[in-house]
Design a protein with these regions (language model features):
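Glyoxalase I/VOC metalloenzyme domain signal
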Residues: 1-6, 11-33, 43-98, 116-132
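Glycine-rich, proline-tolerant flexible connector loops at the mouths of alpha/beta enzymes
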Residues: 38-40
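Short, small/polar residue-rich loop motifs at catalytic or cofactor-binding pockets
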Residues: 107-110
Length: 132
């Protein structure tokens, strides 16, 4: 049997701040998770999204340090409509999260916007333009 892709893991500096951001994107994360060193959430697609604090990673990899420079990954969230892309981008940036690129109509047929989570990871918001 071949390995199965199952989890996308994020290493975070502040668990509560990171989970607050992802709750705004509709993820159902319990409030008590804010104080945990590891959080694991099953997504409707069957994949899991996991968060670990830097201290958790360093507990088994003592010399590990967070990567420097730009984001190394991007998580993309599909929105129901182009208007929802605009609305979600506005809500996140008004709440103080970094907007990396304001919504635009991409040549590949989607309304697209780019934000950053509290750890600087890229988070894409998109919707098909044909659904507008």
């Amino acid at each position: 049997m071949a390995p199965t892709f199952d989890v996308i893991g994020l290493v975070v500096a502040d668990m509560a701040a990171s989970l607050a951001f992802y709750r705004r994107l509709g993820l159902d994360l319990p409030p008590e998770a804010d104080n945990e060193p590891h959080v694991d959430l099953a997504l409707p697609s069957g994949l899991r999204l996991a968060w670990d604090t830097v201290a958790t990673i360093q507990s088994f990899e003592p010399d590990w340090t967070p990567p420097q420079g730009g984001p190394r990954i991007a998580l993309a969230f599909r929105c129901d409509s182009p208007a929802e892309v605009d609305r979600t981008y506005a809500e996140l940036t008004e709440a103080g999260y970094e907007g990396h690129r304001k919504p635009w109509d991409a040549f590949w047929g989607q309304r697209y916007a780019l934000v950053r989570d509290p750890d600087g990871n890229g988070v894409d918001l998109f919707a098909s333009l044909s659904e507008s």
